[in-house]
Amino acid sequence: MLLENNQLIIVDIGASGGIDTRWKNLTSYFKCILFEPDPREYSILKENSDSNLIVLNSALSDSNKTVEFHLCQKQEVSSIFPPNFDLLNKFPDSERFKVQKNIRLNTDTLNNQLIKVGVNEVDFIKIDTQGYELPILQGSYDYLDSVIGLEIEVEFVEMYKGQPLFDEVDGFVKSKNFSLVDLKRYFWKRKGTGNTTNKKGQLIFGDALYFKTPEQILAISNINQEKIIRSIYIYLAYGYVDLSQVLLQEAKNINLLTEEVFTSLVKTLKKYEKNELGKSFRLRKKISNLLHKLSIIINLDEDYSFGTDQKIGN
């Protein structure tokens, strides 16, 4: 296996619910460092941890400081920023944002935390911290040069008071040589708007997927064969076979890959190309979209989020 002695290093910040299953589906050769400041969820993650995972009960920011963390009724929406009920009360189920308790946390930077656990390089970072993504990114600068991809929750309206919005986060990430490749959008409809089942509401937030392009990867200082291999697998984790193909060929053209590794990667990509062919029929996509719409119509509790994209990546 190409990753057997060259494991992926993944960081998951705001790790409620555990690591994305896409990584375990991709390979068993990875290490993931999970950060979860909410003591309720941290205990669950720690209990279910395995040898691939390092679970840390640390709050991250752009510096060392003390912050107030708002523990909400629904654990997943807890945030350092207070909920903005002037906005949230216009939409259904705002009660889940009700703050049950405030706790004070000492923050640290991702730079410092990764040094403490002996991680020198990272391949992928996912951040879902309810509006606090930008300060965390600003405290990660030592590692961003080596990172291939980012999945970041972004908001288009102020769900939390004082939070940075998409344009600020997007500007910072692009300044670090990442390109936006996909956006899973979440739409909400206003309360009490009657039968609007098949109509989208307002764009509220999303999950943004950023990659370094093949050209940007090849421009990384001290780029080597091992990093090329991991980069290709990062692309494949999200279904971007085309980016994998381009990176593979360009790396071969400048003699970054041995013939043995190149041949092995070609075989790997052929498997994914076959999978893509099986997914390419338009009828399958139409049926999938129809079933998604029917599920929302049947489950009226989810009606306010009609139009939300089903997934991120291919």
Give names to the regions the model predicted.
Residues 1-314:
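Phosphate/nucleotide-binding beta-alpha loop and adjacent structural elements of enzyme active sites
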